Amino acid sequence: MFWQVLIILIAPAMKSTRQFLLRRLLAAALMSAFGAHAGDSAPPAPQAQLIGRFADGVSAGTAEIVAFHAASRSAFITVDRRNQPSSFQRVSLRGLNSSALANPVQASNLTSGAITSVASHVNDAGFTAGGVQSLDIAGDLLAIAVQASPKTDPGLVAFYRLDTQGNASFLKKVNVGSLPDGLKFSPDGSQLVVANEGELSATFATDGIDPVGSISIIAVKQGMPADQAVTLDFSDFNAGAKRSIELPAAVRIGRIGASVAQDLEPEYVSISADSSRAYVTLQENNAVAVVNLRQPHIERLLPMGIKDHGLARNALAASDQVEPPFQLKSYNQLFGLYMPDGIATFRVNGSEYFITANEGDDRDDFQKPGETARVRNLALDAAAFPDAAALQANHELGRLNVFNTMGRNSQGQYEKLHILGGRSFSIHNARTGAQVYESGSELERLAYSRLDASLLGHAQVKGRLDNKGPEPESVVVGQVGSRLYAFVGLERASAIAIYDVSKPTAPRFVQWLQNSTDLANGDLSPEGLAFVPAAHSPTGNALLLAGYEVSGSLAVYEIR
């Protein structure tokens, strides 16, 4: 548009074909000289509106993870609550239309099928289900990640066949590693990749049990999964092992005394468009593992790097002892480990990228003493922090949780402080691992500017400023028209941020989705997201399915 206006201003009014051609040539010359191109002006962004919702009134324990089955036009959600553990449920999207919900916070216009107990199909003398962690669907094949009880024992994947009505028939179970936390079918449906977190025992302080993290690959041929998985662990990266020199120094090994294989904890899986590689987040380790699926092995470990909160673009709100409106500030010698949770891959102009939701996590629930401390309780190096007394006040950094094992000098004083998570999303070139974009403080700014004062003061938001802010939890990418959009779930803000990522180096914010008025009602804490392309949607337009961990609800947004 700029170039069109410029030509109108500097060229005479069009009176002939010759003048018209001259104007077009002049426009082309200017565009070439200044690097403009037709793609500089993005088409109008699509808008998402809430058209469907399922809430059974039970709250937590339902709908944490969601997947879509095209043939039956159904969503499948995990169910794991006290009276219905280790289960899943079908929610029908048949008959869904494009009308916005009239009372979105209270509405529940979707019908559900019976809850299916996975435990009843997999429990035997050698295995007791300890909960369902994730699910995914390829064609008519449903896969459920099931942790064992205790969680440190090897888990399994339960497979079901779905019919056109969404009825599920149990097929088989396949053993995998300890605590299968995330799983994903390859785009071609030929493999299922499972991230086995291998988390510390809940009673680690007394029993010392720390299983290895691992990645399982289950082949699928003609719609039937193999009886056995290929499971890869990280023992080759242990000290003195054959690949120990390949372990980047920037990959965080957090627990003193742990081997590399024990400390690396796979969390979430995404797979390249050509089904050749899996990208698996190692959240506690601030890294991503690249897995070759054609000749199964771990190719390399990619450290995600460090975020400098001394830069203005990375300012943050760091205290839960202040009242809104929150002021974002930058602090010298304060850094963040990205520690990605959710991950998604996408391709632009032949290049593969992955996008991560940089939530952060620690092991304090299991590891005693813990690995974090509040800044007010630390001895700060006077040269690095000449204003230490002021910084350690509760209304500044005093309440902020940081890693207590990083950034100390030889006297045990802290020269640098490292927080958990990036409070952001970032995009990486999948081939090189290089970060090509990072959202800085934008997610925090969006959250705090879009919530009113009463919501900002809620413990769900204010109470997390000293930890991980809005907590980017999950991310999916989908195509709407000719554009690619990322949907980033913010757990503590109970919101989803939509970005146009068609240009991976310069994403553009599009829309903020939130269906809660007081952080006590409506849809709370998005955990799992699933994108439904228009070609498979019951409305003919793309859909976003969102599972909410705290409210136990499922939301369906139409994007058009």
Model-derived features with residue positions:
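Beta-sheet-rich non-transmembrane sensory/scaffold domains
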Residues: 39-560
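N-terminal secretory signal peptides that target proteins for export/translocation
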Residues: 1-20
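Gram-negative bacterial Sec-dependent N-terminal signal peptides
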Residues: 15-37
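Short, flexible coil/linker elements and helix-boundary hinge sites characteristic
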Residues: 5, 10-11, 34-38, 103, ...
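Intrinsically disordered, low-complexity segments enriched in polar/charged small residues
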Residues: 9, 23, 28-29, 189, ...
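Intrinsically disordered, low-complexity serine/threonine-rich segments
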Residues: 5, 19, 35-37, 44, ...
